[in-house]
Regions:
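Active-site loop/lid in soluble adenylation, ligation, and acyl-transfer enzymes
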Residues: 1-100, 208-215, 219-247, 253
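Generic recognition of stable, solvent-exposed alpha-helical segments in well-folded globular domains
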Residues: 4, 123, 127-134, 193, ...
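A short mid-domain helix/strand-loop element embedded in enzyme catalytic domains
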Residues: 89-122
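A long amphipathic alpha-helix within ATP-dependent nucleotide-binding catalytic cores
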Residues: 120-151
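C-terminal helix-cap and adjacent tail motif
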Residues: 170-231
Length: 253
């Protein structure tokens, strides 16, 4: 589902930013992969190689997660000063760019725009910020009309043939906070269509938050899957089972 939702967004956003997707049609993959068709169908992409920036590009439209925690302590998020008196889950006056490091293991670490520029340069930082906020704004407007608030999300970018392109995944429940619009109310944590359900379950356990993580009960896995599939349906207008037929249709048009 994550792969298929990314494919949907890559297509939707292609007028805003180029991406690394070549095809999701396994029949068009290199010949040596044909014997793995059953395993690859619907859950893989053939992508272009890119030199990836070592930065997670986060866009926040609402105050939640690590941003909310940092705001409570400093009144800022990643060096961005915010108005006083905001509540958890409040909509921000405007979306903000809050980059983070790409950790090899453990959690990513929030950094400022200045620290980002020190790592990758002023011009690259300016362009990544511009792309991140443009993508977020377009996707958030689309999702809002379909009953989903994209509270925040993160992107990765790379360089191919001198052009900055989007890579990895795009606007999935793993990389974003998706809230149902009909139940949204600031001042508390929100119901969600993302991995927050798993986070909330893990918070009930006596666990030091170091790998390996505890096993998840089947009930938590099943409920998380339901939430992810509902997000996919609302955003794309299709069930996950429709993917194969729509891919076939796209090859004949």
């Amino acid at each position: 589902m994550l792969t298929q939702l990314s494919i949907f967004w890559f297509d939707f956003l292609k007028g805003t930013v180029a991406n690394h997707l070549i095809t999701a049609d396994v029949g068009a993959y290199p010949a040596p992969l044909s014997e793995y068709r059953e395993q690859l169908e619907g859950r893989s992409m053939l992508v272009a190689r890119a030199e990836v920036f070592p930065i997670e590009c986060v866009a926040r439209g609402y105050l939640a997660g690590s941003g909310w925690k940092e705001y409570q302590q400093t009144g800022e998020v990643c060096g961005v000063k915010l108005p006083a008196g905001l509540k958890e889950s409040d909509r921000l006056p405007e979306p903000i760019f809050t980059p983070a490091t790409k950790a090899e293991s453990g959690h990513d670490i929030n950094i400022s725009e200045r620290e980002t520029a020190d790592r990758i340069g002023e011009e690259a930082t300016r362009r990544l910020k511009e792309l991140t906020l443009a993508i977020y704004s377009r996707a958030a407007e689309y999702a809002d009309a379909r009953g989903i608030i994209i509270a925040d999300t993160k992107f990765e970018f790379g360089v191919k043939d001198g052009q900055i392109i989007m890579v990895d995944e795009a606007l999935t429940p793993d990389s974003s906070r998706f809230w149902p619009k009909e139940t949204y109310a600031p001042g508390r944590s929100q119901q969600s269509f993302d991995k927050q359900y798993v986070r909330d379950y893990l918070e009930t356990l006596d666990w030091n938050k170091q790998p390996p993580g505890p096993a998840l009960p089947d009930s938590v896995v099943a409920r998380t899957s339901e939430k992810y599939l509902e997000a996919y349906r609302l955003l794309t207008g299709h069930s996950i089972a429709d993917f194969g037929s729509r891919l076939a249709d796209s090859k004949t048009t």
